[in-house]
């Protein structure tokens, strides 16, 4: 039996990068997957097509995780399509990087609305759809929550808030048999990282690799494989944890 056989999972921000990889790996592990996206329908459809081509089951649903009505619709459509919900992965992210002097109030609120309010809204909605057997929540945080980088003050603060939220909720939701954990990726090769200037051969990439004991940047599948484990019954006694997946970069 596959690790996530008969499970239904919602993965937010799953049209590309880490979210897309998690969706694909969940499907390969037997889960029925909702590929959520905010604006990239083409990317989400591509992920769904790849999953179905490989024998999996997935649908794409548009929703802005910072919009309460959108979030409510996301989970109602999931329930209608698959009849239940077992796993929620909060991966949708606003990655704004700038010196503190250049951060506008609008950019600040956008980051917190997506990175912090978004998980609040999705978790509230998910709790209404988990059956009496409990559920599983994975928040995709960042190593930047523990080791912030220059020009990433607001982004780092949102992820630190998400980690605190995860720990607090583990104490609140354990009695409902709902597990919740954070995964803190290290320097991972994604479109978001590239938009922040961490491109192949850049000084940023060289710095990250030099400080990573395993000598390379992570790939989205490195994070996805950890997510499959945390989502599975193999991790049944793991909750409230901040699980670093960084090639050793944040192992100090």
Language model segments and positions:
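Alpha-helical segment proximal to the catalytic Tyr-Lys
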Residues: 128, 171-175, 236
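Residue(s) in the substrate-gating loop at a strand-loop-helix junction
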Residues: 142
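Substrate-binding pocket helix/loop in short-chain dehydrogenase/reductase
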Residues: 99-100, 107-112, 204, 208
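A glycine/serine/threonine-rich, flexible loop-to-helix segment
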Residues: 175, 187-212, 222, 252
């Amino acid at each position: 039996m596959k690790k996530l056989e008969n499970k239904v999972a919602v993965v937010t921000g799953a049209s590309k990068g880490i979210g897309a990889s998690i969706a694909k790996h969940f499907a390969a592990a037997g889960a029925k997957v909702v590929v959520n996206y905010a604006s990239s329908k083409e990317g989400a459809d591509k992920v769904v097509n790849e999953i179905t081509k490989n024998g999996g089951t997935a649908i794409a649903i548009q929703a802005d995780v910072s919009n309460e009505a959108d979030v409510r619709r996301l989970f109602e459509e999931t329930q209608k399509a698959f009849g239940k919900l077992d796993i929620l992965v909060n991966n949708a992210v606003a990655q704004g990087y700038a010196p503190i002097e250049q951060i506008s109030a609008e950019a600040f609120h956008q980051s917190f609305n997506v990175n912090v309010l978004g998980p609040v809204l999705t978790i509230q909605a998910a709790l209404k759809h988990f059956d009496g057997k409990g559920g599983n929540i994975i928040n995709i945080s960042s190593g930047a929550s523990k080791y912030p980088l220059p020009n990433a003050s607001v982004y780092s603060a949102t992820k630190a808030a998400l980690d605190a939220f995860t720990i607090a909720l583990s104490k609140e939701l354990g009695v409902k048999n709902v597990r919740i954990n954070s995964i803190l990726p290290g320097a991972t090769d994604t479109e978001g990282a590239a938009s922040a200037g961490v491109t192949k051969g850049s000084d940023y990439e060289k710095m990250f690799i030099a400080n990573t004991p395993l000598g390379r940047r992570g790939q989205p599948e490195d994070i996805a494989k950890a997510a499959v484990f945390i989502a599975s019954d193999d991790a049944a006694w793991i909750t409230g944890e901040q699980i670093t997946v960084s090639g050793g970069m944040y192992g100090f």
